[in-house]
Amino acid sequence: MNIFEPTDADIRLLTPSLRRLVQEYRGSLTPDPVLCVRAAYRALGNPNIFIRFAVKDGELIGFFLGGLSVEMFTGAKIATQIGVMLLPGQTGHLQAFLNEFKTWAKEQRAKRIYMHFAESSERQDKIMKRRGYAPAGTHYMKEI
């Protein structure tokens, strides 16, 4: 598996794989493939956006999107995960994405990394705790 920051040409080449990945994603939210491709293009060249693709045997098997912002009351830079998708059955790749994101966050001088997931699992919880992440509050969602 190869994790890398995509170029415009990579996104064009991997758009069919990206659409397939989004369509096969099994989660509580149903992402729009077209909007995911647009988000990838918008991330290019933006120093405050982190985007990485994971490719295995020429197929896109996952992507990670994150961003940099400032905490309102402390002024500290924070790196926040925006979206992570992996094809079903592609276990073990979250850790590689986390390593890349942490390196980028340090380079950006972020003080904290915030991660959130639409769905949680015991395995994911163990991975996050083992890597030094601690639960920080609770997220709620309501369809309107």
Please describe what each predicted stretch is.
Residues 1-16:
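A short beta-loop-alpha structural element at the N-terminal edge
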Residues 13-20, 39, 96, 100, ...:
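Alpha-helical elements of Rossmann-like donor-binding domains used by nucleotide-donor carbohydrate transfer enzymes
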Residues 22-40:
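Conserved GNAT-fold acetyl-CoA-binding loop/helix
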Residues 41-53:
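A short helix-loop-beta-strand connector motif used in the catalytic cores of GNAT acetyltransferases and
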Residues 53, 59-69:
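Conserved beta-strand in the GNAT
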Residues 70-81, 136:
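A conserved beta-turn-beta hairpin within the catalytic core of GNAT-like acetyltransferases
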Residues 79-126:
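Acyl-donor binding region in acyl/amide transferases
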Residues 116-118, 134-144:
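Conserved catalytic-core motifs of GNAT/GCN5-like acyltransferases
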